[in-house]
């Protein structure tokens, strides 16, 4: 990038800088899959991406990069899932607590959300306490739903319960016993 003489800033109205921003946006959209293939795409890597949207308003010089990252994460299976695989934002759910991830496996998530697509829990290390910026980004920018105990209670239906095995009900009642608010 071309900088100011003191090298403390990057002029926004410079044609070369505008071209470089566009090229960087294209590159980051393309390279994320390769980073995944190399085994380097992790929760900590996602935290290094431009996910603090308040730092990049719509008129920011670097907004095209932010937009490219967002669009790529929405479309492609690049978010670390709890089972060690990856999932796109549209097929991802955040669990409020490890017990919820343990209670509902992939098949049950699909049944609960009445989806024919494979829905997966995001990696358990993505939490309000450990990764607040990433969690907020996933929810507000990528529209990933956070499933809470209350949300589970509202979503459970007769059709969902009728297809669950007896062993699951033992786990379910054990889970409910730890949820005083329900």
Locate the predicted segments by residue:
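GHKL/Bergerat-fold ATPase module
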Residues: 1-182
């Amino acid at each position: 990038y071309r900088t100011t003489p003191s090298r403390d800033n990057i002029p926004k109205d410079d044609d070369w800088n505008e071209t470089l921003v566009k090229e960087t946006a294209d590159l980051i959209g393309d390279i994320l899959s390769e980073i995944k293939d190399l085994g380097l795409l992790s929760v900590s890597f996602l935290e290094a991406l431009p996910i603090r949207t308040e730092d990049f308003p719509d008129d920011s010089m670097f907004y095209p990069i932010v937009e490219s990252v967002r669009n790529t994460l929405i479309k492609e299976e690049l978010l670390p899932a709890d089972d060690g695989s990856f999932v796109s934002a549209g097929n991802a759910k955040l669990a409020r607590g490890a017990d919820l991830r343990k209670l509902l496996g992939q098949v049950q998530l699909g049944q609960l959300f009445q989806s024919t697509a494979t829905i997966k829990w995001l990696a358990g290390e993505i939490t309000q306490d450990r990764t607040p910026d990433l969690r907020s980004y996933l929810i507000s920018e990528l529209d990933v739903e956070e499933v809470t105990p209350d949300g589970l209670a509202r979503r459970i239906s007769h059709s969902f319960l009728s297809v669950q095995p007896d062993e699951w009900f033992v786990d379910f009642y054990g889970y409910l016993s730890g949820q005083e608010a329900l």
